[in-house]
Each structure stands twice: as C-alpha cells, then as structure tokens.
C-alpha cells in the first residue's frame, strides 16, 4: 500500500508529458518515409539497368 501513492504520482506525470515532438523542425528535418521512398526509387532504377546485377555491378559504378 505504500507504493500506491508513488505509482499514482508517476502515472500522472507520465500522462501529462507532451505527446508531440518538442523540438522545432528545421529545413534539414526529413520524415523517414521520404528516405524509404528514395531507397525504393534507387533500387527500382538499378534493377532496370541490364548490366546491374548482384554479381556484376562494375558497369553501374558501384563496384
């Protein structure tokens, strides 16, 4: 029973924290989804090139 008031206080403190990011966004901030989209786009471009393969990527400038 001694822990109950401490637990209630901690619960109230956790519930009162802001649910949004407190840091202001800068122009360099980029959502993670755009990084994933860029990676998918690059992989699609590389898979379209006939010379790019897992074993021989010398003509793509990767190896």
Swiss-Prot record:
Which Pfam families does the UniProt record give?
A: Chi-conotoxin
Q: Which residues form the propeptide?
A: 23-47, 62-63
Q: Which GO terms describe its molecular function?
A: toxin activity
Q: What is its main location?
A: secreted
Q: Which GO terms describe its cellular component?
A: extracellular region
Q: Which InterPro entries match?
A: T-conotoxin
Expression by tissue: Expressed by the venom duct.
Keywords, comma-separated and alphabetical: Amidation, Cleavage on pair of basic residues, Disulfide bond, Secreted, Signal, Toxin
| PTM comment, free text | Contains 2 disulfide bonds that can be either 'C1-C3, C2-C4' or 'C1-C4, C2-C3', since these disulfide connectivities have been observed for conotoxins with cysteine framework V (for examples, see AC P0DQQ7 and AC P81755).
Signal peptide feature range: 1-22
State where the protein is found: Secreted
Q: Does the keyword Signal apply?
A: yes
**Modified-residue entries (Cysteine amide), positions:** 60
Q: What is known of its domains?
A: The cysteine framework is V (CC-CC).
Family label: Belongs to the conotoxin T superfamily.
Q: What is this protein called?
A: Conotoxin LeDr243
């Amino acid at each position: 029973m001694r822990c109950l008031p401490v637990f209630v206080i901690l619960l109230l403190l956790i519930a009162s924290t802001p649910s949004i990011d407190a840091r202001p966004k800068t122009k360099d901030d980029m959502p993670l989804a755009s990084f994933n989209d860029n990676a998918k786009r690059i992989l699609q471009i590389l898979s379209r090139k006939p010379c790019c393969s897992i074993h021989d990527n010398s003509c793509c400038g990767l190896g």
